[in-house]
Regions:
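Conserved, structured C-terminal
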Residues: 3-43, 48-49, 124-383
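Well-ordered mid-protein domain cores that form the structural environment of catalytic cofactors
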Residues: 94-148
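Acidic, proline/glycine-enriched N-terminal capping motif
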Residues: 2-106, 114-116
C-alpha cells in the first residue's frame, strides 16, 4: 500500500526478486534481504526501497536516526599536479576555495552549461580530489571527465573500492560517536576527516541528502557487514532503524533538494534550478560558463518552484502545470510530505508565474487540481 502511495518513476524503479541476477549489488545485499527489505531496480542496482515502511523510516530520520546503504553512489578520484585544474574546468563551483578536509556541492557541466550530473567534491589534498556522483551516472561522468583531461592528472573510476553508509537524523552524531575515537563535533557541516569507525579505516563526511544533520561514511567494501551491524547495534537504544530509497526520496523532497533526472538533467542549467549559488562565474572559464553568463544576462525562460496541493491529491512527475487552461510547465517531483502532512512537489514554470502565493492547477488524470506556489525548501531542520 505505502509503496504504491510513494511510487517512483517506472523508468527508475521496478520490484526485484532474489532471482534478479543482472543487477549490480552492494556488499550489503544479503543483509537487506535478511531484513525483509522490498528490493527495487534503481539505476541498474538492486537496492532496498523500504524495510518497515516509508512513513516509519521517514519519521525516524526526522526525529531520531536512520541508516542508509548508499554504496551504489559512485566515486571518482582525481590526483596529480593538474587535479585542481581539471576539477575547475568540468565543474561550476570554485574548488580553489576549498580547504583540505572540506567538501562542496557542485555541478558537472556540459559545454552548454547544463548538468552532466550533480556531485560532491571533497578536497583530500592540493593534488587529490574525490568526487561523489550519482549511481546511474558514474560511468558517463568518468568518461566526461577523462574526455576533458588535458591536465597532468590521473582520473580513476574508484567506485568499486568504496562502500558508503549514511547515518542521518538528530541522534545520528551521538550514535556514531559511540563507534569512533574521533571527536565528531570537530567535523563541521560539509567537512570530512579520516579516522576509524568500529576499528575500520573510514572517510567520515558531515554531509547528507535528507535535510537533517548526519554523516556519510566511506570505507572498503569488505567491512560493510561488520560496520552495518555495529552501527545498528549502537543505534538501537536511540531508535535508529534501517532506511531505504523510498524514505530517502521523501526526505530530500521535503528538504527541496534536486534529484538528477527530475529537477536537473542535461537540459537544465543551475540558474533555472535555483542553484545559482554553485555557479562561481568569477573563476577561470569552465565548461558552459559562456552560455551560463549569457543566460544570466538575457534572463530565464523557466524557474524551479515548490508547490503545495490544496487537497489530498498528488501532483506527480510529468503532470502538467496550468494557469487557467494554459499549460505553463511540468511537475518534476511530487508526493506526500510525511513530516509536514502535506502533498508537495516541484515544477518548472515561466518566471512570471513563479512568485510565492501564485495559484496554479495541476492536471491529474484529466482533472485540474488546485495548488499554490510556496517557498523552497519546504522543510528546514531546527537549529
Amino acid at each position: 500500500m505505502l509503496a504504491s502511495m510513494f511510487r517512483f518513476s517506472d523508468e527508475k524503479f521496478s520490484v526485484t526478486t532474489p532471482a534478479t541476477a543482472a543487477l549490480r549489488k552492494t556488499a550489503l545485499n544479503s543483509i537487506h534481504r535478511q531484513l525483509g527489505a522490498k528490493m527495487v531496480n534503481f539505476g541498474g542496482w538492486d537496492m532496498p526501497l523500504e524495510y518497515s515502511g516509508i512513513l516509519a523510516e521517514h519519521e525516524a530520520v526526522r526525529t531520531r536516526a536512520g541508516l542508509f546503504d548508499v554504496s551504489h553512489m559512485g566515486e571518482i578520484e582525481i590526483q596529480g599536479p593538474g587535479a585542481l585544474g581539471l576539477v575547475q574546468l568540468v565543474s561550476c563551483n570554485n574548488a580553489a576555495k576549498l580547504a583540505m578536509g572540506q567538501a562542496h556541492y557542485s555541478g558537472l557541466m556540459t559545454s552548454r552549461g547544463t548538468f552532466v550530473d550533480d556531485l560532491l567534491v571533497h578536497k583530500i589534498s592540493d593534488a587529490h580530489y574525490m568526487l561523489c556522483v550519482n549511481a546511474g551516472n558514474q560511468d558517463q561522468d568518468y568518461e566526461h571527465i577523462v574526455e576533458h583531461n588535458k591536465f597532468d592528472a590521473k582520473v580513476e573510476n574508484a567506485g568499486p573500492r568504496y562502500s558508503q553508509l549514511a547515518i542521518q537524523g538528530p541522534r545520528g552524531k551521538d550514535i556514531l560517536q559511540r563507534l569512533t575515537p574521533m571527536e565528531l563535533d570537530s567535523i563541521h557541516y560539509y567537512h570530512f576527516a579520516f579516522g576509524k569507525v568500529s576499528g575500520i579505516d573510514s572517510l567520515i563526511a558531515r554531509t547528507g541528502y535528507t535535510g537533517e544533520d548526519g554523516f556519510e561514511i566511506y570505507f572498503a567494501p569488505e567491512h560493510s557487514e561488520k560496520l552495518w551491524r555495529d552501527l545498528m547495534y549502537a543505534g538501537g537504544p536511540a531508535g535508529m532503524i534501517p532506511c531505504g530509497l523510498g524514505a530517502r526520496n521523501t526526505l530530500r523532497l521535503e528538504a527541496g533538494m534536486c534529484l538528477y533526472g527530475h529537477e536537473i538533467d542535461d537540459t537544465t542549467t543551475p540558474w533555472e534550478a535555483g542553484l545559482g549559488w554553485i555557479c562561481k562565474m568569477e573563476k577561470a572559464p569552465f565548461l558552459g560558463s559562456d552560455d551560463l553568463a549569457r543566460q544570466k544576462k538575457d534572463g530565464l525562460k523557466r524557474k524551479l518552484v515548490g508547490f503545495e496541493m490544496c487537497d489530498k491529491r498528488i501532483g506527480r512527475d510529468g503532470y502538467p502545470v496550468l494557469i487557467g487552461s494554459q499549460e505553463v510547465g511540468r511537475v518534476t517531483s511530487g508526493g506526500p510530505a510525511p513530516f509536514l502532512k502535506k502533498n508537495i512537489g516541484m515544477a518548472y514554470v515561466p518566471p512570471e508565474f513563479s512568485a510565492v502565493g501564485t495559484d496554479i492547477v495541476i492536471g491529474i488524470r484529466g482533472q485540474g487540481e488546485a495548488a499554490r506556489i510556496v517557498a523552497l525548501p519546504f522543510y528546514k531542520r531546527p537549529q
